[in-house]
């Protein structure tokens, strides 16, 4: 599903925003891009929003096959699932992007936006294939997956990457839920304190936010709005940001 956002600029060549879980957030995000692309407070140019739909989020967005729960425990009767993120990445780049660029006036600048499992996929794509997109917006990424396997993998490969010219906005819902045991909060701190500094050393521009009034199920839209606002604020040139 495609929608051309309105605004000033070259109507023939536009940036493309790939929105994972597009069936949930498509219309809202189209509204956000139309607002910012026509606002004097933003440098966001008119862009094309591509809603990316899938039939199995666990399979498509997770890096490993795992039975571990959100608190890190494993029950013997839970069946392992997931592990198809790299296959889905190849579909996204080798098939979907080619189809999009054959149908719409794209200019070669691309954004990837994801929440939850899709936020984890967004971070993994940045870590493994930073050249694939120009800006990444990862909302409350499911770092707990497979007992924090993403952080383990990222710690090994970020040293080999160059993130020059790339931008990451990452946000976490930090409202406490006492009845639920999670390893997510400690992993989010590890991302901030260990992985992100190494990515910055490799020239990645990072904006890290916490939303203390939001939980996992409510953070997506306010954080996507804030991500677009923060990355494209009119007083900041994203080409010069460090």
What are these regions (language model features)?
Residues 16-91, 95, 99, 103:
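Serine-hydrolase catalytic machinery in alpha/beta-hydrolase-like enzymes
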Residues 171, 176-179, 185-192, 196-242:
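C-terminal catalytic histidine-bearing segment of alpha/beta-hydrolase fold enzymes
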Residues 128-165:
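Mobile cap/lid helix-loop segments that gate and shape the active-site cleft of serine hydrolases
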Residues 1-12:
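Single conserved hydrophobic/aromatic residue that forms the stacking wall/gate
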Residues 19-25, 101, 126-127, 135-141, ...:
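Cell-envelope and extracellular/periplasmic
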Residues 33, 119-130:
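Short glycine-enriched nucleophile-adjacent loop
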Residues 52-53, 113-115, 139-140, 171:
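Alpha/beta-hydrolase-fold catalytic nucleophile elbow
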Residues 104-116, 136:
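Alpha/beta-hydrolase fold nucleophile elbow
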């Amino acid at each position: 599903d495609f929608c051309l956002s309105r605004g000033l600029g070259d109507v023939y060549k536009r940036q493309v925003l790939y929105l994972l879980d597009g069936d949930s957030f498509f219309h809202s995000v189209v509204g956000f891009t139309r607002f910012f692309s026509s606002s004097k407070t933003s440098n966001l140019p008119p862009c094309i929003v591509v809603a990316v739909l899938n039939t199995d989020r666990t399979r498509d967005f997770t890096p490993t096959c795992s039975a571990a729960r959100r608190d890190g425990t494993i029950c013997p009767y839970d069946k392992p699932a997931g592990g198809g993120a790299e296959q889905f990445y190849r579909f996204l780049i080798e098939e979907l992007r080619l189809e999009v660029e054959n149908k719409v006036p794209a200019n070669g600048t691309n954004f990837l936006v994801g929440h939850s499992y899709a936020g984890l996929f967004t971070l993994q794509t940045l870590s493994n294939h930073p050249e694939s997109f120009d800006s990444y917006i990862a909302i409350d990424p499911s770092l707990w997956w497979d007992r924090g396997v993403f952080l383990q993998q990222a710690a090994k490969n970020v040293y080999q990457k160059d993130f020059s010219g790339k931008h990451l906005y990452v946000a976490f819902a930090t409202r406490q839920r006492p009845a639920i045991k999670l390893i997510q909060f400690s992993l989010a701190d590890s991302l901030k304190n260990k992985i992100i500094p190494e990515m910055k050393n490799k020239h990645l521009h990072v904006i890290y936010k916490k939303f203390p009034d939001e939980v996992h199920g409510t953070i997506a839209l306010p954080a996507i709005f804030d991500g677009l606002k923060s990355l494209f604020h009119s007083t900041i040139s994203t080409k010069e940001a460090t």
